[in-house]
């Protein structure tokens, strides 16, 4: 019934109270006496929309809509929310507390709020509503008991099930305390929401009605509240909707239909939002204030307790399980353990409220169901670990199960068809029934482990369906048979399905929102296969039904009696009438022909083309496979997230990863039009749109994203971290094509719509981090932020992004195109055999032009060609780059090589070695330039110009231009304007023609050099007259000067003259001067002596292979020797070598002599370097030997050995570069000596040795700046002698002896080393061989252990030689048998 009440101010109540306008003596002039109790606004007779009230017309109406539904910028937890009016003027900030979570409020009409998992709070005069829904509305809970307060307009209805979608709100801790809610320190802010009649009020108090009650929700702020009726009621002037100081930044007044709607306050003592009261009355449409009933704490506590049976305690001492019996006729039951019996109450007939709650306690409890139990609205709460089982197949139904934190319950009881087991609580429920459980599961908190056991037929089904909601729970599968994946759904805010290493196939993923998580949290990799594509033969055929209801898009079959044909129709809407009989379409039916197969294919194609959507998240150790049939063009859209360690595979169709548009509350178009007519264009008509600017960022991480025949797009507000493997696929990173769900926020059903949305802010752009591999005509489009490498074969790469950073990239048969406005940085090496096309775009190599480099990070960049088009085309080559490829500039583009960075003076050794690659410059470029209208700048660059080149404007700073051959013997560099400073031009001549520099308009600068390479040696009589440089006549004579350059082994200085002719000034080559460069020759000679140094190393070790052979008893032996040493010589030469030898020999006793004969193998690894070269020699060899020891003390030793050398060296003189070569050498040596014993334990041993060798000659030929250069060393047979003396002392024990020894030797060459012949354009000269000698000294130990094992260790050095051994350590071991 509808009554009219008005709010009047009461001095007693210190607030507004509701008074009937028809009550006697309650006239407008009277405010002294309460004539009527606070009652209702309008009873709730039906369920309609959501919450609301009266708001002012200064603020956009969408603010109040989003506020009430926790959408837009009012998402739970949001802080410091700034509020602006429709004119963009600042109104205030919601900064007293973070935005509360309104999910506990009934999501349809907002007249009730969940305060306990099974109880809601509202007003008792709302007698018409019988159920509530929460979250996205895909649930319904029925009221089984209204629990009306006796003296207050309040009730706390009980629900039939435990709510799983949301958590109940906290309620006020103070309750009904007079004046409590005037305390601004404790309660600084109050928020309300409701679905009452919707009005907008202007500043004149004029109301405009926007909608009736229960149509939609609105919410906002209210001021502090005064109390009356002993604190049971509170009131405030909420109707003053223009008073922001009193009522906050979003004032709202409760209207008719808002009865029961909640009032929330932030409690600073508890530091959380609490439900303070429920709205009971108002002051009429557009009135001054509202009243609320404060939550009666004692009353609700009483009602909660009334629904509980006595707690059940399991006692181990009683023995046995709690035996649970139940009489379904009476609704009474009992749990008996031993002599103790606990009564319980279940459903009585249709009365669910008769069922009471049971609380179980006692450690490791056991319950056995003897009968099936229907507990009605009664729930089970487990405080301790329990096992619930049945021996006779009994079932249980009720409100649900609560498992406390830290508690584990083993549930071995099945449910019944049509009923869901609701589980909440932070503890773990393990479901371990048997066979097929026809009941469903709804879980809202904690963990549920599905471990259903097979029955005697092998059948397993833990539940017929599983719903995971609220964001709190996790469901774990013990195997893949527990539940049909297609019956799993993630409701409001979702939760986690942990597949636990089990691979599953989903034909549908029913995820309501981002909270849905599909995960695998174990080490065993699981594969999730998506198979949502509809096959034509799976399209169901429907027939006409008298209900006249169906699903739009379904296919219907009609046997037409009028035409004797079989007709097929597609339903267009959810209701229908008769089929058309003339094979036509109308508003309800679409006629699709007479062929069943064609009709089914049409339906399947439409379904597949529409695409599929997953709002949720993929996590953990997963592979995901989505392989669609060929020809399917629909998209799989993911606007949730992914973080998986496996591979996501997509074959055919489309795949879109994108951010998620922020969901907003919305109204019908008629409401939006009505508001727009008043100047408010804020109201939205759908939850998301392509035009909205607010999107949520999403992140996707895969180990690998494998694409085959796929159209892949990374949309706005999405970050992708992965390696993409694309085969015949299109990859668009920064795709403007995006999707919205027109059903977003309203459950698991979705309605996909494709459109475009381009991010204008960097924070909203897509981001890619990783590597892209392209193959088989794939296309990569980079439109947004990109950080990664590209490996492409037979594909295309297009860049339109202004923020692309390329890592190591290799493109084979693949073009790179930079489109207008693009700005890309290749920060690491870039190699392409195809063109790089830069169209009004910028490509930077190594670093951007505005960056200053203080570290050396050299990169190599190569392309078939670098092509610039458009006046805004830019190619920037940063410092420390090695560039290769021709540069072509069509228009007035810009090419810059070198940048402005400076090299750090504190380079590491590694960086110093890297810097040596640049030959003293910061940049190296090899290629030709075709840029007749462009501006080209080079700084600290070595340009190897391998073809005729042109530039409009050229600026050179500390740059060397080397003219090299191309298609013609000589090349020309032509520029209109040249500004050159401290630069050099290296030209070539054959005494007839030469390379040439031509400057057409102006030439400026200073300190520039001209170097000339002579390809042909002129005679002393030749007179040259060859123009090298042509410039305007006004050019300064000293702009260029002749400079000496090292070419080959010589210093070459051209002789230049300057002449004016035909308005031009020319620098003419008249001749040259040449002189030998001793430094280059010395470096070459040092390098050519490497083989001699290696020979000396081998000589010094010929006789140290075996250790002491005296007094050996065995007939044969094996030995191993390891030598490590280093040496040095003139010219900064150093080497370090490691030698490994092994051999075997046999002992022959010949009268007065022991003769040892054997074979040996050897390997040596040598690193050598000097001032101008470095490299490595690896040597392999073998030989044989014989050693004779006379009993008199005399001995001899002979050996012959062959060595093969593999040499790899980098030469930094005369342009020799890398030289890899092989060489061979032979050794033959003989040593004699005599051991004189001074005592039994001391001796002295004079020695003499002669070694002959054969070293192969070596010739090297190359070209240095156009000049033929060679160096040659002849073969040589070195002969080396050595004399010296060794003395030692032996220490002996029972089974061992140790001999210490010291030696001094003089080693000398008896023949000269090989001559070295050096040749260049200046002629040939010879560096004669030489003899060398040195003193060697060392100490050593020889040890014998038993009769078979001998160890030796020796340390040696040399001095006074041109080549010396700096240190050598020799160790050997010998075993005789």
From Swiss-Prot:
Domain Autotransporter span(s) in chain numbering: 1111-1377
One GO term (biological process): proteolysis
InterPro entries: Autotransporte_beta, Autotransporte_beta_dom_sf, Autotransporter_pectin_lyase_C, Bact_Autotransporter_VF, OM_autotransptr_brl_dom, Pectin_lyase_fold/virulence, Peptidase_S1_PA, Peptidase_S6
EC number: 3.4.21.-
The protein's enzyme class: hydrolase
GO cellular component, one term: periplasmic space
Domain Peptidase S6: 53-302
Role summary: Interacts with hemoglobin, degrades it and subsequently binds the released heme. Could make heme accessible not only for E.coli, but also for B.fragilis during mixed intra-abdominal infections. Has a role in abscess formation.
NCBIfam families per the UniProt record, alphabetical: autotrans_barl
This protein's name: Hemoglobin-binding protease hbp autotransporter
Taxonomic lineage from the root: Bacteria, Pseudomonadati, Pseudomonadota, Gammaproteobacteria, Enterobacterales
Gene: hbp
